[in-house]
Curated annotation (Swiss-Prot):
Lineage, opening ranks: Bacteria, Pseudomonadati, Chlamydiota, Chlamydiia, Chlamydiales
GO molecular function, one term: DNA binding
Its biological purpose: DNA-dependent RNA polymerase catalyzes the transcription of DNA into RNA using the four ribonucleoside triphosphates as substrates.
Cofactor(s) annotated in UniProt: Mg(2+); Zn(2+)
Organism: Chlamydia caviae (strain ATCC VR-813 / DSM 19441 / 03DC25 / GPIC)
Originating gene: rpoC
Protein name: DNA-directed RNA polymerase subunit beta'
Pfam name, any one: RNA_pol_Rpb1_3
Cofactor note: Binds 1 Mg(2+) ion per subunit. Binds 2 Zn(2+) ions per subunit.
Entry GO terms, CC: DNA-directed RNA polymerase complex
GO biological process: DNA-templated transcription
Residues the record lists as binding Mg(2+): D463, D465, D467
Annotated binding of Zn(2+) 1, by residue: C72, C74, C87, C90
Length: 1393
C-alpha cells in the first residue's frame, strides 16, 4: 500500500540509479492497474497430485508467470524461441521464471477494509483526520456501532455514534431514508472522502492562534502536522481504506516440498488464504440476501483477516499457526533483527569468502597472512580458470574445473602467480571497530588453518584458543586497489579512537624485549674485575656470541670462565663517537632501532615500547615503523625463548609482615565493633569502617609484596616481577592474590562482604573462603554474558545516530569555539592539556605568557605534538579550539573543526565517515570493559583516602570555604564547593594570595577540593611543609555541624512520628534516628542564644536517616556535631555501573533521585516547609530576583543558609538532569557536562577515547530545536525541527518581510535522534519500522539518499570514502581497448592508473 509511484517519482541519475525515493499511500487504481497482473479468486495453492499451481489461486502461473524458464503451464510452448508468446490454451506467458519474484496480484474485496497501520499505529492518522478517538474508531471499524455520515433532516450530528438500539429508535422516528449512518470500513471511507482538508486546516490554524493552554496547543499542533502532510502531498485520506488487497509475488512467499510429501510454506500464504476464504464467503452471503447480523459478523471477520495479514497481533489475539505459534505477517517481515531491513538489506551474505580457525604465524611479515592452499584454490577458482584458458592449458570451463579438482601441478603454479599482489580481507567477529577487517597479502600454506601475524591480534582482539576468521576476496580492480591502498594491515597500526599504537608487541614479545633491555645485574667491579670497554657494536656482539675478542688487550679482562660477556653485564661501548655505559642486551636491541631515534639506554616495559613506536612513526614514517615492528616481533620471540623465563611456586613470596598487619587489622575491627556495641556508631558506619580497614590492609600488603619481589630482582630476576613489570601478563592486583591475600569480595548484588579472604593462592583457601571466592568469579562470568549484549546494542544506537556525519568540506569558516583545559582531580593532573589539544584546530593566536613576540600557535593551526608540548610547558591554563560541536557545515562537519585523523596523524580527508568512527570508538571499549570484569574474580575495588597529605612546602590558602573552629582548635568545613590550595611562599599577605588565585594570576602547587565535614588541621594562611597532614576526611558520615554557640531545641522531632528510638541489641544504648514520615512535620534542630530559648540564632534541617548526637537543651559550641548522616554501605565500582551510566547520558534520561540545581546566582535561604517539601530560595542580592525550589524532606541538602551559589550548582545530592543544565546554563555548558561525564566513566577504567568522538555524538543529540513562537513561518508551535531547517525557514520569512520564529534547543536521546533523522529509510531500518513508514507515507516524504544506511539499503555506493562526490569525479574509466585487461591481474598497474 505504499510507494505510489515510488520508482516513477524517483529521479534517475547517469548510472541509471535513482537519486531520491518518494513514499506515499497507494490508491486503489495503483494497486489494481499499476501493480497487479491479475485478480486472485481462489484460496488454492498447488494441485495435490501434479504439484502444479492451481489456476486463479495464490500461485497461478497465468497471473504470476511460468514456474520454469521459457515454458508455459500446459507444455505447448517450450524453449526461448517462443519468448513473449501468451499460450492460447493455458494463458501463461512464455518468459523467465524469475518474473514470479516481481509480478504482483490483488484480491478484490467485497467491502472496503481499513488499513490497520493507519488507525492502530499511534498517533492514529484516521483518528486525527476525522477528529475521533481511537476507541470510537475501533467500535465503528469492527461493526459494533453505527456512525452518522449525513444527518439529513434529523437532529443527529455528523460523526455521532449510535448503537443498535439508538439506530433503531432513529429509524423508527425519522425513517430509513432521512439520514445516512453506516458501520465498518465503508463508513470510514465515506467520512474520509467527505472531509474537506483545506477548511479543516484553516480552522485548526485559527484555533491554534486563539488557544492559550499549552497542552491544547501541543495537541492541535500534532493534528495540524498530520493534516498538513495530507494537504501538501498527493495523498487522499480515503486511500487509507482498501478496496483491494495487493498480493506479494509468489516467489517471495514460496511453498517448498519437503521429504515425505509434506510442504513448508511461508506464513503469508496462510494469511492470504484466510482473507480469500472470508472474502469469497462474504460475496456469496451478500448475493443471498442473508440477515444483517450474519453479514455484519462476516464483514468483521474479513476486517480481522486483513488486519492479521498486515500486522498480526496488533488487534486482538494473533492468528496462530501449527504448534501454537503466531503467524508472521507483512509487518514482521520488515521488523527487527530478522526482518527484511536488517537481515537482507543492511547485512548480506557474500560469495568468494571462506572461514577457518586461526593459528599464530610468527614467520609472516606484517602485511601477510597464511591462507590454506585448499581454501585459496576454492576462493580464486574463477581467476585460475581464466588464467588456464589464457595459457591454452584448457579450452572449456568444465575441463578447467576437472583439472582443479585433480590438483594438477599447473593449477598450483597458476594459483601462486594469481595471489601475488591480490590482497584478501580478513575479518573476525564481532567487528567492533574498523580494525576488525583488514587486508593482507596471502601466502599459501599447508594445513587447514589461517595463519595470522601476532601483532595484528590486538586490533582483531583475537587469540588462538579456537577463534575463527573469515576471508573475503575483493574482485574488481577498484576493490583490490582500495584494499591495497587503504586497508592493508600496515596502514592500521594506530587506533582511530585515541591515536595510540595498536600493533604493539605483547605477552612473550614484551617479555623478551624487557629481559633484553633489563638494568644490569652483573657488575664486574663487584667480582674484582673492571668494566669492559668495546670499540664498537660488532665487537660487543662477537664477545656475546662467540666469547672471542678482536683485541687481545680486552681478552685479558675476560671473565673467569673465559666465555666473553653476560647479556646483563655492565659494559662501556663507543657508539657514534661517544662512550656509553650500557649492557650487551641493549646494544643488541638498538641494532633494530631506526638511527633517527638514537640509542635507547633504559628498560623497556610495554608502555615505553608503545611510546617508541609512536615516536618512530612521527620521525621516520610508516614504512620504517612497520619494518621496526616486524624486527621487534622477531627479537622479542627469540629473546623470550633464550631467557626461558618460567614461574615456580617459590617465586611467589609471602610478605613477612603479613601476620603482624593482619593481627593489627583484626584489633582495629574489634575496636569498631566495640564502638558499635557501645552505640557510638551505627551499623552502616561499622560496615563502612570495617571495609576501609581491610582495604587499607590490602593495599599495604600488596605494596609490601611488590617491593619484596622487586628487591630480589636486583641480583637475580624474579620471573613473576619480570612478567608484571614488563606489562607482559598479570598486574599488581593478581600478584596480591597470589602472595598476599585475596582481599575483600563482593556479593552477587554488588555489596561487599565484610570479612575478607585473608589467605592467598600460594597458601591455599579454606572451604569457606573458596565458596565466598566463587561468588565473585560467577558474578563476573554472568555479568560478561549479559553486558556484552547491552554494549552491542549501545554501539548499534550510536552508529545509527551518527552514521551520516561525514567530512563534507575543508573549512566551514566558523568563528565559534569551545574552551578546554587540563583535567584535574584535586592536585593530580588526570589528563594534561597537551593530550587534549593535540590534533585540534586552535581558534585564536596563542602566545607565550608575558611575551607577545613568541607565537606558539597561529589561529587556524592544527596543533602538532611539538606545539602541544610547548603550549603545556608555557603553563597556559586553557585554550580556545574549534570543535564539531560548533561546526557550521550545512551537512556533516568540516575537516578544520574535526582536526587530525588519529589513525594516521594527518588532517582528516573529505568523505571520511567520522560519525561511524566516533560510534565505534565509544562502543568498542564498552564491550571490552564488560568482557574484562571477571579477570579480577569479583574483587571489591574500592578506594579510600582518609587524610590529605601535602607534597610541597608553602602556604595553605582557603578558597570559597565557610569554616568553624571546633573544640580541638581544628577548622571544620561547612559548605561543599570549596578548596584548599598550597601556594609557593612568596612573602605576600593572605588577601593578596586569595586575590591572585581567584584571578588565576598565580598557580597553586596543589589543589584539594574539600567536602562538607572535612577537618582542616592547618589554619588559613599558615605555612605547611612537605609530608605534613593538612586535613582529615570523614568517609563514613555526612556531619551536620553547629556554627554558632547556644542551646539546643528539637523542632518537629516527635518520637514515634518523625523520630524513633532504636535500642542497640548488644549494649542497650538508645539512639535517636530521624525516620521517613508522611506528616506535616519538618525535623530540625534550632539553636537559641540563651537557655530560656527566646532568641533564635540558627536552624539545622535534619534529613531522614540521620542520627542525632545532641540532647534537648544541651549547650553547644561552634564545631560541635549536632547529627550525622551515614553515607550507606560502599558498593563496588565497576564498569557494570559504567555502561548503564554511558547509556543514561547518551539517551538523555532523567537519572533516578536527581539533584536540584540553582537556576540563578545568589544566596541560599529557607522559607519554611509546605506539603512535605522544604522551600529553598536562591536570592540575587543585586537584582532582588528570587527562585524557589521545593525539595523533598528526604533529600539531603549540600548547601546551607547564607551560602553563595552559582547558576547550575547542585543544591542537593544526586546526579544532575542534563535537560535542566540546558535550560539553565545553555548549550555550551551542557555539551561540556556530557563530554566530561562520558569521559569520566571510561577514564575510571583506564580507557583512552579522544574527546572529538564524544563531541560528535553530543552534536547529534543537540541538532533539533523546539518552536516556542512560530511567527509568520510555516512551522508549528511545539514542533521539533532541525536547526538548519529552522534557520533556513527564518531566512526565507525575513526576506519576505515576515516575523521569524523563536525556538529553544532540545536535547534528544540517541534513539529518538535516530528516529528523527531526515531519511525515512534509515529510521525505518533502526526501530519502530511500521510507525516510521506510516508517518512517511502519509506526508509523501522524499528520501534524498544522503546518508550511508539508506544507500546501502537501496544497493547504491555509499557517499563516503572513495564513494564521496569529490572522489567519484576523479575516477577514470578504462578505455575500450583496456577492458579485456580488467581481470588480467598482472596488468593491475596499467588499469589502476
Amino acid at each position: 500500500m505504499f510507494g505510489e509511484g515510488s520508482r516513477d517519482n524517483a529521479t534517475l541519475s547517469k548510472e541509471g540509479l535513482f537519486d531520491k525515493l518518494e513514499i506515499g499511500i497507494a490508491s486503489d487504481i495503483t494497486i489494481r492497474d499499476k501493480w497487479s497482473c491479475g485478480e486472485i479468486k481462489k484460496p488454492e495453492t498447488i494441485n495435490y497430485r501434479t504439484f502444479k499451481p492451481e489456476k486463479g489461486g495464490l500461485f497461478c502461473e497465468k497471473i504470476f508467470g511460468p514456474t520454469k524458464d521459457w515454458e508455459c503451464c500446459c507444455g505447448k510452448y517450450k524453449k526461448i524461441k517462443h519468448k513473449g508468446i501468451v499460450c492460447d490454451r493455458c494463458g501463461v506467458e512464455v518468459t523467465l521464471s524469475k518474473v514470479r519474484r516481481e509480478r504482483m496480484a490483488h484480491i478484490e474485496l467485497a467491502v472496503p477494509i481499513v488499513h490497520i497501520w493507519f488507525f492502530k499505529t499511534t498517533p492514529s492518522r484516521i483518528g486525527n483526520v476525522l477528529g475521533m478517538t481511537a476507541s470510537d474508531l475501533e467500535r465503528i471499524i469492527y461493526y459494533e456501532e453505527y456512525v452518522v455520515i449525513d444527518p439529513g433532516k434529523t437532529d443527529l450530528n455528523k460523526k455521532q455514534l449510535l448503537n443498535d438500539a439508538q439506530y433503531r429508535e432513529v429509524v423508527e422516528k425519522w425513517g430509513k431514508d432521512a439520514f445516512v449512518a453506516k458501520m465498518g470500513g465503508e463508513a470510514i471511507y465515506d467520512l474520509l472522502k467527505s472531509e474537506d482538508l483545506q477548511s479543516l486546516l484553516k480552522e485548526l490554524k485559527d484555533r491554534l492562534r486563539k488557544t492559550k493552554s499549552q497542552q491544547a496547543r501541543m495537541k492541535l499542533a500534532k493534528r495540524l502536522k498530520i493534516i498538513e502532510g495530507f494537504v501538501s502531498s498527493s495523498n487522499h485520506p480515503e486511500w487509507m481504506v482498501l478496496k483491494s488487497v495487493p498480493v506479494v509475488p509468489p516467489d517471495l512467499r514460496p511453498l517448498v516440498p519437503l521429504d515425505g510429501g509434506r510442504f513448508a510454506t511461508s506464513d503469508l500464504n496462510d494469511l492470504y488464504r484466510r482473507v480469500i476464504n472470508r472474502n469469497n464467503r462474504l460475496k456469496a452471503i451478500l448475493r443471498l440476501k442473508t440477515p444483517e447480523v450474519i453479514v455484519r459478523n462476516e464483514k468483521r471477520m474479513l476486517q480481522e483477516a486483513v488486519d492479521a495479514l498486515f500486522d498480526n497481533g496488533r488487534h486482538g489475539h494473533p492468528v496462530m499457526g501449527a504448534g501454537n505459534r503466531p503467524l508472521k505477517s507483512l509487518s514482521e517481515m520488515l521488523k527487527g533483527k530478522n526482518g527484511r531491513f536488517r537481515q537482507n538489506l543492511l547485512g548480506k551474505r557474500v560469495d568468494y569468502s571462506g572461514r577457518s580457525v586461526i593459528i599464530v604465524g610468527p614467520e609472516l611479515k606484517f602485511n601477510q597472512c597464511g591462507l590454506p592452499k585448499e581454501m585459496a584454490l576454492e576462493l580464486f577458482e574463477p581467476f585460475i580458470i581464466k588464467r588456464l584458458k589464457d595459457q591454452g592449458s584448457v579450452y572449456t570451463i568444465r575441463s578447467a574445473k576437472k583439472m582443479i579438482q585433480r590438483g594438477a601441478p599447473e593449477v598450483w603454479d597458476v594459483l601462486e602467480e594469481i595471489i601475488k599482489g591480490h590482497p584478501v580481507l580478513l575479518n573476525r567477529a564481532p567487528t567492533l571497530h574498523r580494525l576488525g577487517i583488514q587486508a593482507f597479502e596471502p601466502v599459501l600454506i599447508e594445513g587447514k588453518a589461517i595463519r595470522v601475524h601476532p601483532l595484528v591480534c590486538a586490533a582483531f582482539n583475537a587469540d588462538f584458543d579456537g577463534d575463527q576468521m573469515a576471508v573475503h576476496v575483493p574482485l574488481s580492480i577498484e576493490a583490490q586497489l582500495e584494499a591495497k591502498v587503504l586497508m592493508m594491515a600496515p596502514d592500521n597500526i594506530f587506533l582511530p579512537s585515541s591515536g595510540k599504537p595498536v600493533a604493539t608487541p605483547s605477552k612473550d614479545m614484551t617479555l623478551g624485549i624487557y629481559y633484553l633491555m633489563a638494568d644490569p645485574t652483573y657488575f664486574p667491579e663487584d667480582h674484582g674485575g673492571k668494566i669492559k670497554i668495546f670499540r664498537d657494536v660488532t665487537e660487543v656482539l662477537r664477545a656475546l656470541y662467540t666469547g672471542g675478542f678482536l683485541d687481545e688487550r680486552i681478552n685479558n679482562r675476560c671473565d673467569e670462565t673465559g666465555r666473553g660477556i653476560h647479556i646483563h653485564e655492565k659494559i662501556k661501548v663507543r657508539i657514534d663517537g661517544q662512550i656509553i655505559e650500557t649492557t650487551p642486551g641493549r646494544v643488541l636491541f638498538n641494532r633494530i632501532v631506526p638511527k633517527e631515534l638514537g640509542f635507547q639506554n633504559y628498560s623497556m616495559p610495554s608502555k615505553r615500547i608503545s611510546e617508541l613506536i609512536l615516536q618512530c612513526y612521527k620521525k621516520v614514517g610508516l614504512e620504517a615503523t612497520v619494518r621496526f615492528l616486524d624486527d621487534l616481533k622477531d627479537l622479542g620471540f627469540i629473546q623470550a625463548t633464550k631467557a626461558a623465563i618460567s614461574m615456580g611456586l617459590k617465586d611467589v613470596r609471602i610478605p613477612e609482615i603479613k601476620s603482624e598487619i593482619l593481627k593489627e587489622a583484626y584489633d582495629k575491627v574489634a575496636v569498631v565493633k566495640k564502638q558499635y556495641d557501645d552505640g557510638i556508631i551505627t551499623d552502616g558506619e561499622r560496615h563502612s569502617k570495617t571495609i576501609s580497614i581491610w582495604t587499607e590492609v590490602s593495599e599495604l600488603l600488596s605494596d609490601a609484596l611488590y617491593v619484596e619481589i622487586s628487591k630480589q630482582a636486583k641480583s637475580k630476576h624474579n620471573p613473576l616481577f619480570l612478567m608484571i613489570d614488563s606489562g607482559a601478563r598479570g598486574n599488581k592486583s593478581q600478584l596480591k592474590q597470589l602472595g598476599a591475600l585475596r582481599g575483600l569480595m563482593a556479593k552477587p548484588n554488588g555489596a561487599i562482604i565484610e570479612s575478607p579472604i585473608t589467605s592467598n593462592f600460594r597458601e591455599g583457601l579454606t572451604v569457606l573462603e573458596y565458596s565466598i571466592s566463587s561468588h565473585g568469579a560467577r558474578k563476573g562470568l554472568a555479568d560478561t554474558a549479559l553486558k556484552t549484549a547491552d554494549s552491542g546494542y549501545l554501539t548499534r544506537r550510536l552508529v545509527d545516530v551518527a552514521q551520516d556525519v561525514i567530512i563534507t568540506e575543508k573549512d566551514c569558516g566558523t568563528l565559534n569555539h569551545i574552551e578546554i583545559s587540563a583535567i584535574r582531580q584535586g592536585s593530580e593532573e588526570l589528563l594534561p592539556l597537551k593530550d587534549r589539544i593535540y590534533g585540534r584546530t586552535v581558534s585564536e593566536d596563542i602566545y607565550q605568557p608575558g611575551d607577545k613576540s613568541k607565537l606558539l600557535a597561529k589561529n587556524g593551526d592544527v596543533v602538532t605534538s611539538a606545539q602541544a608540548e610547548l603550549i603545556d610547558d608555557a603553563g597556559i591554563e586553557s585554550i580556545k579550539i574549534r570543535s564539531t560541536l560548533t561546526c557550521e557545515s550545512r551537512r556533516g562537519v568540516c575537516a578544520k573543526c574535526y582536526g587530525l585523523n588519529l589513525a594516521n596523524g594527518r588532517l582528516i580527508g573529505l568523505g571520511e565517515a567520522v560519525g561511524i568512527i566516533a560510534a565505534q570508538s565509544i562502543g568498542e571499549p564498552g564491550t571490552q570493559l564488560t568482557m574484562r570484569t571477571f579477570h579480577l574474580g569479583g574483587i571489591a575495588a574500592t578506594s579510600s583516602t582518609p587524610e590529605i597529605v601535602t607534597d610541597n612546602d608553602g602556604i595553605l590558602v582557603y578558597m570559597d570555604l565557610r569554616v568553624v573552629v571546633g573544640q580541638d582548635g581544628n577548622h571544620l568545613v561547612l559548605n561543599k564547593k570549596g578548596a584548599i590550595h598550597v601556594v609557593r611562599d612568596e612573602g605576600r599577605s593572605l588577601e593578596e594570595y586569595k586575590k591572585l588565585l581567584s584571578t588565576k594570576s598565580i598557580e597553586s602547587l596543589e589543589t584539594y577540593p574539600v567536602e562538607l565535614g572535612v577537618k582542616i588541621l592547618v589554619g588559613d594562611g599558615e605555612k605547611v611543609s612537605s609530608g605534613q597532614r593538612i586535613a582529615e576526611v570523614e568517609l563514613h558520615n555526612i556531619p551536620i555541624i553547629c556554627d554558632k554557640p547556644g542551646f539546643v531545641k528539637y523542632e518537629d522531632l516527635v518520637e514515634g512520628i518523625s523520630t524513633e528510638k532504636v535500642v542497640n541489641k548488644n549494649t542497650g544504648l538508645v539512639e535517636l534516628i530521624v525516620k521517613q514520615h508522611r506528616g506535616e512535620l519538618h525535623p530540625q534542630i534550632a539553636i537559641y542564644s540563651d537557655a530560656g530559648l527566646t532568641e533564635l540564632v540558627g536552624t539545622y534541617a535534619i534529613p531522614s536517616g540521620a542520627i542525632i548526637s545532641v540532647e534537648e537543651n544541651q549547650k553547644v559550641d561552634p564545631g560541635m556535631l549536632l547529627a550525622r548522616l551515614p553515607r550507606g554501605a560502599i558498593k563496588t565500582k565497576d564498569i557494570t555501573g559504567g555502561l548503564p551510566r554511558v547509556a543514561e547520558l547518551v539517551e538523555a534520561r532523567k537519572p533516578e533521585d536527581a539533584a536540584d540545581i540553582a537556576k540563578i546566582d545568589g544566596v541560599v535561604d529557607f522559607k519554611g516547609i509546605q506539603k512535605n517539601k522544604r522551600i529553598l530560595v536562591v536570592r540575587d542580592e543585586i537584582t532582588g530576583m528570587e527562585e524557589e525550589h521545593l525539595i523533598p524532606l528526604t533529600k539531603h541538602l549540600i548547601v546551607q543558609r547564607g551560602d553563595n551559589v552559582m547558576k547550575g550548582q547542585q543544591l542537593t545530592d544526586g546526579l544532575v538532569v542534563p535537560h535542566e543544565i540546558l535550560e539553565i546554563c545553555g548549550v555550551r555548558e551542557l555539551q561540556k557536562y556530557l563530554v566530561n561525564e562520558v569521559q569520566e566513566v571510561y577514564r575510571l577504567q583506564g580507557v583512552d577515547i579522544n574527546d572529538k568522538h564524544i563531541e560528535i555524538i553530543v552534536r547529534q543529540m543537540l541538532q533539533k530545536v523546539r518552536i516556542t513562537d512560530p511567527g509568520d513561518t510555516t512551522l508549528l508551535f511545539g514542533e521539533e525541527v532541525n536547526k538548519k531547517e529552522f534557520y533556513e525557514e527564518n531566512r526565507r520569512t525575513e526576506e519576505d518581510g515576515g516575523k521569524p520564529a523563536q525556538a529553544v534547543p532540545v536535547l534528544l536521546g540517541i534513539t529518538k535522534a535516530s528516529l528523527g533523522t531526515e531519511s525515512f529509510i534509515s529510521a525505518a531500518s533502526f526501530q519502530d519500522t511500521t510507525r516510521v513508514l506510516t508517518d512517511a507515507a502519509c506526508s509523501s516524504k522524499t528520501d534524498y539518499l544522503l546518508g550511508f544506511k539508506e544507500n546501502v539499503i537501496m544497493g547504491h555506493m555509499i557517499p563516503g570514502g572513495t564513494g564521496f562526490d569529490t572522489h567519484k569525479r576523479i575516477k577514470q574509466y578504462l578505455e575500450k581497448e583496456q577492458e579485456d585487461l580488467v581481470f588480467d591481474f598482472e596488468s593491475e598497474s596499467e588499469c589502476a592508473c
